[in-house]
Amino acid sequence: MKLEKLPEEFVQAKPVLEKIIEHGFEAYFVGGSVRDILLGREIHDVDIATSAYPEEIKDIFPYTIDVGIEHGTVLVLAGKSEAEHYEITTFRTESKYTDYRRPDHVDFVRDLREDLKRRDFTINAFACDVNGQIIDLFDGLTDLKERRLTAVGSALERFNEDALRIMRAMRFAATLDFQIENKTFLAMCESAHLLEKISVERIFIEFDKLLLGQDWRNGLTLLLKSGAYKYLPDLQDSALKKVLTDLSVDFHFQNSEQAWAALLTRFSNVDVKTFLRKWKVSNEFAKFVADLVSAYELDSWDLMSLYHFGLEKVLLVDELKVAYGLKINREQAVTINNQLQIHDKSEIVIAGKDLMEEFSLEPGPELGKILKIIEEKIVKNELKNEQAAIFAEVKKML
């Protein structure tokens, strides 16, 4: 098939491909960008594959950066903006994956078929030439039409090469609303234990995208059916099942933190921060999720809880509670938030140094205690956030 019109991202990159072709080599748009065009989705990255070897690409273009030259990838700086920087990768074949993550070595080749047949799924194995002609060597167009995910060649080999492809399959099922072809799914089940060989950081990225997918239920169901969850840090099948049964069927997560909090509210006897530490997330992410889980356990909001958690988190929790079938007062959080004089400690008009100067106080626990009391009284609207009022209140304490 041929595209009626090249997308703007391809039009912008077209001169790069044409220059490679002028020098006697082949060059194509490949991978996820071609798939997304065919699905009518937004393109994120433009990937270019070529029969030219890395050194030949560097001879063609004056400005390049070696970003992964050992794997055949050179960054071509076709313009000043980052949007005009393109990763160009030589056609290649790959050796065995002894670590189930990356090939021991790659061999550069001139044949497009050899390059495409090493890819994970047929819907990711398309190539598109400068005129918009789609090259489909593995019947990916049929799979695309039938919304089916099929491994290229032997599914077992593909998953043994890189076990992360098991998570990618479930992520694609969730984000694209695809079903997984039977042989491919059976190979996923057989290879699921290999996920233990994959870094938890890489698994987190795929699982996180799965949860944010429009059909995350499909992805989560596949995670359970395949048994892959057993090889991910501390996932409880009972909790995953509760998420599927308890959340309203049309609910979609607003962000990653809300999605992970939704999971953790269904867990039994879990320390949120310990759990997330095993997933090696950032401290900031872990705190956000832990706050959501803590806030979820509250029956109602008051000034202190709004101040402590903040309106953003409270509204995310309210959404979650509604999705889990709990009755809440949707207006309560906003109403209470509007009653707060301050939303952060930094908004208090005085600081510790002001009290030290005014009352000849020394730094230490006593000063800290006074500041804490002042903060709480302001939050509860028992004290105005004004210097004179605060000084008068402190005077009473001393």
Curated annotation (Swiss-Prot):
Positions in coiled-coil regions: none
EC number: 2.7.7.72
Keyword Transmembrane annotated: no
Annotated positions binding ATP: G32, R35, R119, D162, R165, R168, R171
InterPro entries, alphabetized: Bact_CCA-adding_enz_type3_sf, CCA-adding_enz_C, CCA-adding_enz_firmicutes, NT_sf, PolA_pol_head_dom, PolyA_RNA-bd
GO biological process, one term: tRNA 3'-terminal CCA addition
Enzyme class: transferase
Record keywords, A-Z: ATP-binding, Magnesium, Metal-binding, Nucleotide-binding, Nucleotidyltransferase, RNA repair, RNA-binding, Transferase, tRNA processing
Binding residues annotated for Mg(2+), in chain numbering: D45, D47
Top-rank lineage group of the source organism: Bacteria
Binding site for CTP: G32, R35, R119, D162, R165, R168, R171
Catalytic reaction(s) noted: a tRNA precursor + 2 CTP + ATP = a tRNA with a 3' CCA end + 3 diphosphate; a tRNA with a 3' CCA end + 2 CTP + ATP = a tRNA with a 3' CCACCA end + 3 diphosphate
Cofactor(s) the record lists: Mg(2+)
Miscellaneous comment as given in the Swiss-Prot or TrEMBL entry: A single active site specifically recognizes both ATP and CTP and is responsible for their addition.
Record-linked HAMAP family: CCA_bact_type3
Subunit structure: Homodimer.
Record protein name field: CCA-adding enzyme
Gene: cca
